[in-house]
Structures are given as structure tokens and as C-alpha cells.
Amino acid sequence: MEIDKVKNIFRQTYLADASRKENDAEHAWHMAIMAVLLSEYSNEKIDVLKTMTMLLIHDIVEIDAGDTYAYDEDGKKTQRQRELAAADRIFGLLPSDQAEYMRGLWDEFEERKTPEAKFARTLDNIQPVMLNNASGGRSWEEKCVHLNQILKRNENTKDGSETLWDYAYNNFIKPNVEKGKIKED
């Protein structure tokens, strides 16, 4: 039942209808579906089931570590340490074979070296951009997010899919800069 706690970890991104903020369970589910539907846009051939599983567990450490907002520079200073400790505890609850498999997938996601991890990271970066656009840029506007912050956070997004990054930039980010929802530098 430990995994049920991800339903109570709320992110800074609003749902598409802007009615409330998204939780980690919704975020993971949304990206797992995206992996199935958008896998053809991966730069490299990927194992879709492996990518889905990676996406479903990638934020499970936030049960202990909490969600670190994408543009929270102070929070990022301790994020890795908090998440490693959380991974040890949470994956340690599983039988050893499952713990080893799941922890391996989590580590792979964090390292961003395999085609699956690169594509999963692309989706993890693009999904909140999609939601921010759909909600009228609400979170970006509330947090006074600047274009340079978004570009820095997404500097490796194209590694998983150049096509999806180009689409997200031109259809979600650029129009929100033009509308003033994202601050220009």
C-alpha cells in the first residue's frame, strides 16, 4: 500500500482544465499512455513496456523526498540526496528480485543513458509543458517562469525525441512567451 501515497504528492502543474494541481499518480499514468502513443517519435527504437514501467515508478521516491519544483534552485541542492535515501527505503520494501529490477529502472531513468531513459525523460519534461499550455500558462504565470529557465531545464529533452521537443517548443512554449505567460529574458 506504500505506492498509494503518490496520490497525495501534488505537483506545481495544474490539470489541463486548471481546476487543481496534478498529483504524482496522475502524472505517471499520463506519461505511461504518452509512451505508448508517442513512441514512434523516439530518436531511437525503444522497449515501450520498459519505458512505461520506468515512467510509472520514476517519481515514487517523492513519497519520502517530496516533489521538487522544476525551477526551485534551493530544493535541487538536496534533491539527489533525498531521492537516493527514499529509493533505498521504498524499493527495499519489495522482495529482493523486484527491488533489484525496480531500483535498476529508477537508476537507469536518473542516468539518462539508454534510449528508454532518454525518451522517458523527454516525456517527463514535455508533459508538464503540455499541461501548462492547456491550462492557459497558469503555473508559469503564477511562478513568474522565464524562457531561459524552461530552455535550461529542457536542454536534453531533444535527446529522447527531437520531433517532440520541436513540437513542444513551437506549439506550447513559444505561444506562451508571445502571450506573456512565460517571461522573456
Each language-model region and where it sits:
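Alpha-helical, largely C-terminal catalytic domains
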Residues: 1-185
